[in-house]
Amino acid sequence: MKLKTKAKALRGRLRVPGDKSISHRAVIFGAIAEGQTVIHGLLRGQDVLATIQAFRDLGVTIYESADSLIIEGRGFKGLKPAQKPLDMGNSGTSMRLLAGLLAAQDFSVQLLGDDSLSRRPMDRITIPLSLMGAELSGQGEKELPPLIVKGCQELRPIHYQLPVASAQVKSAILLAALQTQGETVILEKELTRNHTEEMIEQFGGKLSVAGKQISIKGPQRLQGQTLQIPGDLSSAAFWLAAGLIVPGSDLVLENVGINPTRTGLLEVIEKMGGRISYQAVDKDRQAATLKVSYSTLKGIEISGDLIPRLIDELPVIALLATQAQGTTYIRDAQELRVKETDRIQAVTDVLGQMGADIQATEDGMVTRGKTPLHGAAVSTCGDHRIGMMTAIAALLVEEGQVTLERAEAILTSYPDFFKDLERLWHD
């Protein structure tokens, strides 16, 4: 598709879709809790729809009302064997978290994914879940999907140190541990997003968190809840970037999630000199209204324990770096190479083809700015975040046309992305 270029300014107010990470977990916990769960603000992107369909295939009743999703929870013991493989689509979150949950069931299930998901390593979950007593098998050394999970109703508790900073791996172990007799202890390499821990407590479960150590005793029973999901900071990130780098822009984003384990991007914006302010802060719901406007940015270094708190925002941060004065270094981000695509390579390829001075390193990128961007024919590589990064980058293009292949990948997390762009466009 041809992307909009030569933006004069973006202005207006916007509500981004519900948080993808929280939406997945809300559906999962609603299904395994006892009683009804009502979810408001759910993201209805393709990834979350895959999670919903998986639980329908496992015998859970899920239906929609005008503004909510209603789940009739069956408890941990109420899931039924699926009559066919569960299709996770493009969603690594769905596959890894469901593998953890299903590791304690008394039936076997096959988890499938699309071409992109079928290249993502699952050994990071098969190893700890196998230590607990489940049988999991994928393809090759890295246990690539399809993944067969043969559950065990008498899992063993484990003490496990995560070899990578991954909220998905942590969550898979926690979902298994909730069904396991005894205490499981997880030690994180770096602090990662804590939505699963928060949701366990929200549904009436108990766990203990001390720094990077999480302890949980099972088995537990959970109770259905009513949830309000905030807007996704990872989706808001693209509009925050647009507001900062498109001259004359002034944007207000309402009801954006600001969980502290996710706000690394906001800290980076401030360090780069971006004009950003917080309004209507709701500490209980961890949400706020964010206001940004066009800014003069400077290059910085991004590394260490900040990386897990902005891992999904690094593509758009790389775009910001192309419009910042000086050099921006992104380090310690090798996890980007095993996302929906190799995001280090994809980001440097796309922005490089558009004229940016950007080089890939083994664990990140080096970007020298400020550089003008020009037209190019590029691809999302099937990755929604690469697609949205490119659409925002195209707004700066004054010469040439930007064409984007496989733009449908954006439907994974932001079905109305281009509609929202039209709303903010000012000639």
Swiss-Prot record:
Key word Cytoplasm present: yes
User: Could you give one GO CC term from the UniProt record?
Assistant: cytoplasm
* The protein's annotated pathway: Metabolic intermediate biosynthesis; chorismate biosynthesis; chorismate from D-erythrose 4-phosphate and phosphoenolpyruvate: step 6/7
Report the active site residues.
Answer: 312
Molecular function in Gene Ontology: 3-phosphoshikimate 1-carboxyvinyltransferase activity
Supply the InterPro entries for this chain. Answer: Enolpyruvate_Tfrase_dom, Enolpyruvate_Tfrase_sf, EPSP_synthase, EPSP_synthase_CS, RNA3'P_cycl/enolpyr_Trfase_a/b
Q: What is its EC number?
A: 2.5.1.19
**One annotated GO biological process:** amino acid biosynthetic process
Give the residues the record marks as binding phosphoenolpyruvate.
20, 92, 120, 168, 343, 385
KW Amino-acid biosynthesis (keyword) present: yes
Q: Where in the cell is it found?
A: Cytoplasm
Query: Main role?
Result: Catalyzes the transfer of the enolpyruvyl moiety of phosphoenolpyruvate (PEP) to the 5-hydroxyl of shikimate-3-phosphate (S3P) to produce enolpyruvyl shikimate-3-phosphate and inorganic phosphate.
Concerning its family, UniProt says: Belongs to the EPSP synthase family.
Q: How does it assemble?
A: Monomer.
PANTHER family on file:
AROM/DEHYDROQUINATE SYNTHASE, PENTAFUNCTIONAL AROM POLYPEPTIDE
The protein here is known as 3-phosphoshikimate 1-carboxyvinyltransferase
The scientific name of the source species is Streptococcus equi subsp. equi (strain 4047)
Q: What is the lineage of its organism?
A: Bacteria, Bacillati, Bacillota, Bacilli, Lactobacillales
